[in-house]
Regions:
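Soluble or luminal CAZymes and related metallo-dependent hydrolases
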Residues: 18-22, 92-94, 131-142, 175, ...
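Metal-dependent phosphoester-hydrolase catalytic domains
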Residues: 32, 36-37, 86-88, 149, ...
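Short, flexible/disordered intra-domain loops and linkers
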Residues: 17-21, 123-131, 166-174
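Active-site beta-strand/loop signature of hydrolases that rely on acidic residues for catalysis
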Residues: 6-13, 26-48, 111, 142-168, ...
Length: 242
């Protein structure tokens, strides 16, 4: 649909401050895409001030090892947010979800920024009372119920899924199946190896049937010799489904 696409950028910032070479390079890379929407994980609040626009963030993560400005999930838009939800489902591990509705060139869009727990969450750190993949599966179960009740608007879900799609070594088949079930009604446009990248990622963009992909491309985490992150970035242009 001519004139109705928007760019959604996703980048892992690896807790770097914006005035460090790594953080500054990451911010510059996102700015170069001139997105309408951006979703970031493992990032710091307030570091997209140079963009203008509006930011929403998940609740602070639990644990003393996190700085006061660290967040697991952030979403940014050129336009104001409304109907913001930083809880989702109270049973989900805290601080890994934020959602809001914003206006884009395709109209109103519901954006859900997420950071699904990695397989060792609360195993090596935190409460240390969980088994591998337990928190990941628990989060997916609760998030799946939340997704089923979401709005009829165009929906974008983006963030760190902590799984490669399709499944490769690492995730047990039941874990991959759980993720697939939650997103059965969505198109995960970043599946496989995005153009511009040399490997599949664990950061993804998923869209519901109100939207269609126009293009998807990625960029490696090394930008001109500067390591901007421990993950690659990805951007998708989408339009309203015909």
């Amino acid at each position: 649909m001519s004139g109705s696409s928007y760019a959604n950028c996703l980048l892992e910032l690896e807790r770097k401050k914006s005035h460090t070479p790594t953080g500054a390079a990451a911010i510059a890379r996102i700015a170069a895409e001139d997105p309408e929407l951006a979703v970031l994980t493992e990032a710091r609040i307030g570091h997209r001030e140079s963009f203008g626009g509006y930011e929403i963030a998940s609740q602070p993560p639990a644990g003393e090892r996190f700085a006061a400005d660290e967040r697991k999930a952030l979403a940014w838009s050129q336009n104001p947010w409304r109907n913001v939800d930083a809880v989702g489902d109270e049973r989900m591990p805290i601080g890994r979800f934020v959602a809001g509705t914003t206006t884009t060139s395709v109209g109103d869009v519901r954006v859900m920024a997420i950071c699904i727990p990695w397989h060792m969450c609360d195993v090596r750190y935190g409460s240390k009372d969980r088994k591998p993949w337990e928190q990941h599966l628990r989060w997916l179960e609760c998030f799946g119920e939340l997704m089923a009740a979401e709005s009829s608007l165009p929906v974008v879900v983006a963030g760190d899924f902590n799984q490669r799609i399709p499944r490769r070594k690492g995730a047990p088949s039941d874990v991959a199946d759980a993720l697939a079930s939650v997103f059965a009604a969505f198109d995960i446009v970043t599946s496989g190896v995005p153009a511009g990248c040399a490997r599949p990622g664990i950061d993804h963009i998923a869209i519901n049937d109100r939207l269609q992909r126009a293009s998807v491309r990625g960029w490696p985490n090394d930008q001109g010799g500067t390591r901007t992150s421990d993950h690659d970035g990805v951007v998708a242009d989408v339009h309203l489904a015909r």
